[in-house]
Each structure stands twice: as structure tokens, then as C-alpha cells.
């Protein structure tokens, strides 16, 4: 971090929370494009010209504020041809650099907060992997779950107002406000899709940062309503800092929430509240009664609308009883079912049959959403009948097989934690036959004739064993059959967040 401070000149800018001057530094845009802190390129390059970089960025910002974005002089176009491509290029270039800059003060304050309070970083930076042991260990003892679609702001200005608590630089906030306004005009930055956020792919990093900082505002209330809750980390931010400046905001919210919600805290004294957020959805699980969950439901709706100015309705929160309903979360249909068993007990001359029901946590592959994703990607129709992939017909045979095989392995990899894999076998069949149809289309033949000519070994890629990777397994006892037990039980792989989009359908 000392190298970052020296490199970004943060000691000088951070004293007054000035971020705007950093946007004129060329190395900011190198970081935005993942060039990293390469000293030979950024610090020791003889061709580095800070003045030319300053002029380029100033011209881009000037054109952003102009009414007509297509009025570009001939001289400027000759010197910097990339400025004349389209009006969106300047927005994207500046916003990519701005997304790097706006994260700097939060990372510094997060580190200083952790050092001052001696909080272990691993407790703060939890990831998706902590969700799986939570599901297996905690769900069996819970009764109800609130399935919540995270609300969205009713106006983009709310996102700017959220950052005003942390960023004091008026110029940076004004530039951010301009970004949001322009993005909304030509690409609909945030649109209500299933009452959740839909981010533009043009600069997902900036939008996810704004989204997580906004959600963090009203998520902080759970710290005070349930101080010992199982607070698990959101991972939708990708490369962003997780839970930026979260602990640093606790002291501020303690004073606010203690005054506004003191009369309501007694309603929620539940020692078994668990909260998880992931990809625009969240769940609030409890061992309490249906009445308590209804209180939580209407409390959250009123809290969001009255105190955080986000649009939410009661129908966006569903109360599910785990014993009767399945929960669609993290690409699985999760439920808790009773597994009946009968125990024979004998005392002296009398014997008894005792019915015993054991709770079991089930994770099922959701076949209908997966088929919908495959149909959207043109691997099959809406009924699940495999079709060829014409856009891949120009590739080589090995490339076609490799693409289909990669998707198939990713799906198997992700759903390895499923307790029932019959649905997954159907997905593999669809992909295998779609691959065969694509190859037959390329060679202008039928599937039967093509497979007869080349042999079925050509598609053995779909049935190759996966490479051993680090995984989460929870053996109950050591035994001689422990190795066999691991293969029969569900396995949560630690790299499932880096998979194809088909493995996690919306």
C-alpha cells in the first residue's frame, strides 16, 4: 500500500479528498486496462509524456460536456484519430479511469479501519465459498426463508448521494453525475429487470461499484438488528473491493439507527438470523415463526422506501417454509426434506418400532432454467430438442468439440454439489447431440452418417474426467472407505465462480 500511495500521490490528494486531479494521469488508464503497476512501462518509460496525456483527457472531458459530440476539428482528428470514432468512446475511456480512481479512498480507509480496530481481514472479506457450508450446516435447523429481490433506486441521483458520505470532491461527484446522465440517455444504465439491477456491459466495473456501495448502505442495518448474525459476503462485484469501507461505516450507522429504529428493535430479537446476498438476490433465514418473518418483510419494505428511497413492494419478498418449498438460489433448487426412518428398540421382552424423521438438505439441478439458457444460446429449442449451432460451423472440428466440451464440463463442475444429478445428464445429452448436429452440418451430412464415418470416439470429450481441483468437502468420520465416501457425497468446488454463464442462468 505504501507503493500505491507513492505511485498515486495519494498523500497529497487524500488530505482533502481530491480525486479529480488523478483522472488526468495516464497510468490510471493503464490500470483500468489491466496493465498493472509495471515500473518499466509507467515510471521508467522515456516516451511517457504527461502533458500530452493531460491534453487528451481534457479534450475528452470538454467534448463530453459539449452539446454536439460530433464536432471534432480536423487537426484533433489527425492527432488523435480514436477521438472521432463515436461519441461513446470518450464516455467509456473516462469512466474506466474514473472507476479505478473512485475505489482508491475506500481501499485506504478500509485498511486503516482494519488496522485501527485490529479486525482480522479474513472475517471481513468472506467469499462465495462460505455460502456452501452455511447451506449444509445451518439450513437443516432453520424454518423460514425470506427470498428477497434487492430493490433498485428510483433515481440515479441516489447513487451519487450515497458516495457523498465518502467522497468530498465536488468535481468528481459532478463528473459521476454526468456519466450517469449520459449512460441513461443512450444505453439505459439501470433498468428494472425482475426488480433487480441490470448493468451495462460497457463499464461493468463502475456500475457494480456504485451498486455495491448503495446496497451496503441499507445492508448495514443488519449489523445492529442482529449483531451475531452469519453475515456472508457478496461476490457479484467481481474484481472490486469486497464490502468497501464496511466496518468504517458502522460507527456512523450506530448513531443513526439507534435513534430511528430503537422502538422497533425489540421485534427482531432472534438469535438465529442469517443473511446472504448474491447476484441481485438475498435471503434472510430464521428459526422463528411465520409471524416473525412477516414482520421482517414489511419492516424491510418500509425501511427501503422511507429511509433509503428505493422502490420496493411486498410482492418482491417471498416467505418460504423450507419443509414445503424449494429455494432457487445460486443456480440450485435447495430444500430441506424429512427422510423417514424406522428404529427397532427392545427392552427386556418388549420391542418397539420408533418412527424417526431426519432432516436432509437437498440441492437439485433446475432443469427448466438450464434448458431456457441453452435455448437462448441456440443449442436447443424451447422444448429441449437439440439443434445445430450454425455460427460455429465455420470452425475446425477440434474447436467445435472444445467449445461444447468446455460448456459441458463447466456445468458439471458447477452442479457437482447437487444431490440429484439426473437432470444434469439430460443437459449433457443436449450438448452432445447439438455438437454432433453442428459437425454434421459443417460436413454436409446427417448425424447418423457422420458418426458412423468418424466413430463415436470423436465426442468422448464430454465424458472425460475432470481434473482434480481444490474443493470443499465435509467428512463426518474417518474410515477406510473415506475415499469412496468423498465421491458419493456432494462436492463444492472453489473455482465455480469462473465458469460459463450457462452454468448460472437468470
UniProtKB/Swiss-Prot annotation:
GO terms for biological process: mRNA processing; RNA splicing; tRNA processing. One of its GO terms (cellular component) is chloroplast. Keywords: Chloroplast, mRNA processing, Plastid, RNA-binding, tRNA processing. It is found in: Plastid, Chloroplast. One of its GO terms (molecular function) is RNA binding. InterPro entries: Domain_X (IPR024937), Maturase_MatK (IPR002866), Maturase_MatK_N (IPR024942). It comes from the Eukaryota. It holds the Pfam family Intron_maturas2. Belongs to the intron maturase 2 family. MatK subfamily. Usually encoded in the trnK tRNA gene intron. Probably assists in splicing its own and other chloroplast group II introns. This is Maturase K. It comes from Hydrangea macrophylla (Bigleaf hydrangea). The lineage of its organism: Eukaryota, Viridiplantae, Streptophyta, Embryophyta, Tracheophyta.
Amino acid at each position: 500500500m505504501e507503493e500505491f500511495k507513492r505511485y498515486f500521490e495519494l498523500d497529497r490528494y487524500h488530505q482533502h479528498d481530491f480525486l479529480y486531479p488523478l483522472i488526468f494521469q495516464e497510468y490510471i488508464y493503464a490500470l483500468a486496462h489491466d496493465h498493472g503497476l509495471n515500473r518499466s512501462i509507467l515510471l521508467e518509460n522515456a516516451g511517457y509524456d504527461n502533458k500530452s496525456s493531460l491534453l487528451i483527457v481534457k479534450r475528452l472531458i470538454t467534448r463530453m460536456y459539449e452539446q454536439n459530440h460530433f464536432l471534432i476539428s480536423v487537426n484533433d482528428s489527425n492527432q488523435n484519430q480514436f477521438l472521432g470514432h463515436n461519441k461513446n468512446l470518450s464516455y467509456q475511456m473516462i469512466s474506466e479511469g474514473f472507476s479505478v480512481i473512485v475505489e482508491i479512498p475506500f481501499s485506504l480507509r478500509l485498511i486503516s479501519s482494519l488496522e485501527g480496530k485490529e479486525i482480522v481481514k479474513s472475517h471481513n472479506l468472506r467469499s462465495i465459498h462460505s455460502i456452501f457450508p452455511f447451506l449444509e450446516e445451518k439450513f437443516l435447523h432453520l424454518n423460514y426463508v425470506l427470498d428477497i429481490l434487492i430493490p433498485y433506486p428510483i433515481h440515479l441521483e441516489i447513487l451519487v448521494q450515497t458516495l457523498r458520505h465518502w467522497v468530498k470532491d465536488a468535481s468528481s461527484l459532478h463528473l459521476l453525475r454526468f456519466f450517469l446522465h449520459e449512460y441513461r440517455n443512450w444505453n439505459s444504465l439501470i433498468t428494472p429487470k425482475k426488480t433487480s439491477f441490470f448493468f451495462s456491459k460497457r463499464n461493468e466495473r463502475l456500475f457494480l461499484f456504485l451498486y455495491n456501495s448503495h446496497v451496503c448502505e441499507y445492508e448495514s442495518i443488519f449489523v445492529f438488528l442482529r449483531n451475531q448474525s452469519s453475515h456472508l459476503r457478496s461476490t457479484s462485484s467481481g474484481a472490486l473491493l469486497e464490502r468497501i469501507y464496511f466496518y468504517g461505516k458502522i460507527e456512523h450507522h450506530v448513531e443513526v439507527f439507534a435513534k430511528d429504529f430503537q422502538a422497533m428493535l425489540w421485534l427482531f430479537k432472534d438469535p438465529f438470523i442469517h443473511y446472504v446476498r448474491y447476484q441481485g438476490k438475498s435471503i434472510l433465514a430464521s428459526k422463528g415463526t411465520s409471524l416473525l418473518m412477516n414482520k421482517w418483510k414489511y419492516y424491510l419494505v418500509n425501511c427501503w422506501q422511507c429511509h433509503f428511497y428505493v422502490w420496493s413492494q411486498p410482492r418482491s419478498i417471498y416467505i418460504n417454509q423450507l419443509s414445503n418449498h424449494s429455494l432457487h438460489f445460486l443456480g440450485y433448487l435447495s430444500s430441506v426434506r424429512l427422510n423417514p426412518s424406522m428404529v427397532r428398540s427392545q427392552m427386556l421382552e418388549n420391542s418397539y418400532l420408533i418412527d424417526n424423521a431426519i432432516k436432509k438438505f437437498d440441492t437439485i439441478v433446475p432443469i427448466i432454467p438450464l434448458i431456457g439458457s441453452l435455448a437462448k444460446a441456440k443449442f436447443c429449442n424451447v422444448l429441449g430438442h437439440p439443434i445445430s449451432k450454425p455460427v460455429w460451423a465455420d470452425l475446425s472440428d477440434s474447436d467445435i468439440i472444445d467449445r461444447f466440451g468446455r460448456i459441458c464440463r463447466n456445468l458439471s463442475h458447477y452442479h457437482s454439489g447437487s444431490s440429484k444429478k439426473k437432470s444434469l445428464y439430460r443437459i449433457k445429452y443436449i450438448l452432445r447431440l447439438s455438437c454432433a448436429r453442428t459437425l454434421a452440418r459443417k460436413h454436409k451430412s446427417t448425424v447418423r452418417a457422420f458418426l458412423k464415418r468418424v466413430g463415436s470416439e470423436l465426442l468422448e470429450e464430454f465424458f472425460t474426467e475432470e481434473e482434480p481441483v481444490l474443493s470443499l468437502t465435509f467428512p463426518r468420520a474417518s474410515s477406510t472407505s473415506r475415499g469412496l465416501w468423498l465421491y458419493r457425497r456432494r462436492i463444492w468446488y472453489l473455482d465455480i465462480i469462473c465458469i460459463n454463464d450457462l452454468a448460472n442462468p437468470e
